Amino acid sequence: MEEIRESSNFIHDFVAEDIAPGGRFAGKTVHTRFPPEPNGYLHIGHCKALCIDFGTAEKFGGLCNLRMDDTNPAKEDTEFVDAIQEDIRWLGFDWGDRFFYGSDYFEKTYELAVGLIKKGLAYVCELTPEEFSAYRGDTTHPAVSPYRDRPIEESLDLFARMRAGEFPEGKYTLRAKIDLASGNFNMRDPVLYRIRYIEHHRQGTKWCIFPMYDLAHPIQDALEGITHSLCSLEYEDHRPLYNWVIENCDVPSKPRQIEFARLGINYTVMSKRKLRRLVEEGRVSGWDDPRMPTLCGLRRRGYTPHSIRDFTDRIGVSKVTSTVDYSLLESCLRDDLNANAKRVMAVLRPVKLTITNYPEGQTELFDVENNPVAENAGTRPVSFSRTLWVEQDDFMEEPVKKYNRLYPGNEVRLKGAYIVRCTGCVKDADGRVTEILCEYDPETRGGNTPDGRKVRGTIHWVDANNCANAEVRLYDMLFSDPEPDAPGKDFIDCLNPNSLETLTGCKVEKSLEDCTATDRFQFLRLGYFAPDNKDSAPGHLVFNRAVALKDSFKKD
């Protein structure tokens, strides 16, 4: 993994204090965890948490566990478990042998819940959610519960029968007995367990009661020896409950919860529910559609692990929620690919160019640089012949002002080859240009002018006698509105109808037939491109535009 520049954050400050002499974790190894819920694919928003969890452990020479938070059986699937692991490995992080499932702790969590009942700190409640809301009180009136003083033995019996499947969903819950007058409503006897008759992706039908996140999460952290439980800001007012569970359950360690602000990016949505709707309604081709903010979508589009880690590093860690410009993500990729991507020539909207005074049947090879900003990138041989492909918009029969490319009488430099002068064109019956006619100056091999004359325009080209055909997909923002998620909007109405343009019959250098899914290229003058890791195959090359050469962000 390439070096990412160092940036300070308050989490690292807290961790440094905790492991210093006299700190709460003095002498201990820093131990974090990344606990995704396997009910969808990871997206760029998760990436911030992922990089914070793994990055914090990495910085302090510690460990980071990967734990599937599968305590809620609804919509959890092994498909997502596998995809999450692939995404994390792709980013360059490693959890070693510390891969866990939250459901692995179901039995222990149940035992600890029984312990809370025995201590008089939990009770079985018969109130429905609607009824409890009525009993819950408000900021000036404490809550009340008719079941709060249920005898311990009765709660133990009912809880065991809940596990045995004797009651329907919604009949009973297990509640913590904390403080019905607390100003933090999360502490007003929160639900710890509920009845759900639903098959679990790993446990099958073994369990019909499932722990709530606020109970399961701190117990799992403590059982794994986590020192720092790093989570998003929405859990800040859940921290007292997290600490209450740790203090009152017989667990082997006492982790510290620290919260940070979530990542928001304009021109996108990151709700799993909304992303799932895009997939299910066929508005994108799948979770890995290159327009999606999922990591598999970004990878397919052409994003690199370094660019995404650089992005999370640049935005930093904060307690203040903010929205980041999508252009920053593009900039990180552009910087990475500018330094590392091989330069090649591709013609997306081809028109034939014939050099009328070039010998028929002759082919030359030119050594063309692979990357002018990379010292050891070297060169590659590119073939050149009488017939080339060039871009349609590199020719105008009647040029506009300051147009320096091909038009009758004008000279241009063919990148790395010769200088040619346009002598005319050939049109079809409808008046469309089908061929551009030029003459070359044989004294200008390599693009130099021995007589010192100035040639303003330089265009790219592909040898028509030695090239490959390709399909090229030009991607833009999935949404045309910078705030598709804003209140009062249906995000579907904000979809960009021009987010994808597919071009067929494109012409690329012959060498690209041997490219692999991990290769990244700069198509000269056109942008940065990557082979589509799903659709591209020998004999059918498909390239995705990962990012334009310049900032495409729409500014007011």
Task: Please name every model-derived segment.
Residues 7-16, 20-85, 200-232:
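N-terminal catalytic cores of NTP/NDP-binding nucleotidyl/phosphoryl-transfer enzymes
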Residues 66, 70-72, 115-275, 333, ...:
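Active-site cores that bind ATP or allylic diphosphates and position pyrophosphate for catalysis
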Residues 21-26, 55-63, 89-96, 119, ...:
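Secondary-structure transition/capping motifs at alpha-helix termini
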Residues 235-239, 243-245, 306-309, 313-316, ...:
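Core subunits and conserved enzymes of cellular information-processing
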Residues 80-106, 112-115, 120-123:
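A glycine-rich helix N-cap at a beta->alpha junction
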Residues 253-332:
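Long, charged, mostly alpha-helical binding arms that flank functional sites
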Residues 36-38, 67-75, 97-107, 130, ...:
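Conserved short loop/turn motifs at secondary-structure junctions
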